[in-house]
Amino acid sequence: MQMPSGLMACMLFIIWAATISNVYASEQLLGGRAFTAPGVTIPMGADWEAQGITHKTESPVDLAVALDQQLYPALVPLIKTFAQKHGVKIAVQNGTCGISAGLLSGKAADMGGFCCAPALTDRLPGLKFHTIGIGALALITNTTNPLHNIDVGDARALFGNDIRDWSELPMSGFKVGTHKPVRAIARLHCKVRPGHWRLILDSEQDFGWDITEVSAIKDMVKQVSLTPGAVGYETLWHIDRLKHEEGSQVKILSVNGAAPRDDHALAQGRYPLYRVFNITTWADGAAHTKLGDALADYLIARAADIKPEFAIVPATTLRQNGWMFEDNELIAEPD
């Protein structure tokens, strides 16, 4: 008697979860994981693996691509150039990491784009990750804050509620006897994925009980711009974009003496907070396309041509500075 494919997939998932639980638990103890192991994939069952890609676009296309909200404006000009050069139609959807993950798991996209390193649950059978580059995650305060530089340990204390008043922070610039309560703003997106805000504190439970949590990028920047004593975080492109579009002005801090706008410090690993920008392709089987491979190769090769306003340090520069890769995927910081 043949076991139903759904039951088989469920059993495979249980076995898979058991095999990685010890490794995952030990990583959790370290806190602030930047990456997951590239050799582990989540089981989806034979029926799923045999499926090809079914596009859900309004009209027929050669490739369907879903990108997160920072890769979308950064890569669309390159994708358009590629499509014109090859005489093909490529549909590009502007979304989030979650939307990309959903379309990939539903076999509805030839390529996905993420602003985070993959979670274990993103590692689908046959799916390959290719790193475009990384972008600094800047710590931001209200413009009235006299602080210019912060140690990453002190930053963790601010978000973790271990430092409750800016006057408690050494070299904060606040005069003796002056009190300014810390108002930590957090956007806890992509909780299952490593890196990004989890390089500050590894889980939402590590953040202080009195943080103000926001769901949208614009709310993060706006709240910090309007709230004396506030501290938050965001990528440089979103900070600059919202200053132009909505007038939200914030102060950007250096961390451990390195400025987030210093691409050399980021590439050398001296600036410690960043997002990883990845795209995906299907390696084999019915979902694989040579055109998808060609597009990925083109985007990686042209990553250095992405406009500077997007503040992405390309993978080629990371390789030159000792970051570790498996094939095209960034998997570890430099030693």
Enumerate the language-model features and the residues they cover.
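Bacterial N-terminal signal peptides
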Residues: 8-19
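Flexible loop/hinge segments at secondary-structure junctions
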Residues: 24-335
